[in-house]
Amino acid sequence: DGNIWGGEFFLFDGKTMERAGHLEYLPLPGGEASIKKPYRIAAAYGQYLLNEIPAAVFPREYQSELELISKQLDSGFNLAWTSSLGRLFDAASALLLGVCPAITFEAQAAIALENCVDPGITAKYGHQIIQSDGQSIVSLKEMWRQLNDDVKNGIKPGVCSAKFHNTIVDFTLAMCDNLKLKSEIKTVALSGGVFQSRALLGHVQQGLLQRG
C-alpha cells in the first residue's frame, strides 16, 4: 500500500494469506534513513501522537533537527509511514535511554531496551484495538502517552522498559484472540527480529499456551 510494513498480523488457511491487522501507521521522517538515528523516530512519534517532543530527552544541540522533523510532519515532505514494530522499539529506546547519535549494528536500540528490563514488573501501558476497513488496528497513542508521562516523571528506565515489553505482549495476545474468533485458526507463527527478544518471545509463548 506504499507504506513500510513490519508490525503485521496475517491469517493463512493453507492456501491464501490475508493481512488481517497491523500496528497503526506512524511517521518516519527521512524514511528508512531514520533507522540509524532512533531519536528522530522518537521525536516524530511524540509530535504525531501527542503533539509533544519531550525537550528534556534531547540535548540542546538537537533542537534545530527537532524543529526540522516538526516541519516535515506538517508538510509531509520526505516523510514515510510505517507499521513497524522494530521502529516502535527504536523510538521507545531513544525516549527511555537517551539520544544515541548513530546506530552501529542491527537492533542496537532494541537490545539496549531489553537489557534494562526490570523482570519484577508486571504492569503495562494501555492500548486500544480498533476496526478499520475490515482490519484490526493497534492504536498506540495511549501507550505512548503513558510512556512519555513516566519518562517526564522520572520513573526508572528498567520499569518503563518492562511495562513497554509487557504492553507488546498484551496487544499481541489480544490480536491473536481476535483472529482466532474470526477464523478458528489456533496455530500461531511468530517471526521478525523483535521476537529475538527473550523477554518478548517467552511471555508471548506462555500466553499463547495458556490460551490453548
Residues of each region from the PLM?
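Flexible loop/turn segments at secondary-structure boundaries
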Residues: 1, 30, 91, 196-199
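Gly/Thr-rich phosphate-binding beta-strand-loop-beta motif of the actin/hexokinase/Hsp70
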Residues: 1-12
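Short helix/loop capping segments that flank catalytic or ligand/cofactor-binding pockets
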Residues: 2-3, 19-20, 92-93
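A contiguous, well-structured pocket-lining segment that forms one wall/lid of small-molecule binding clefts
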Residues: 41-185, 199-209
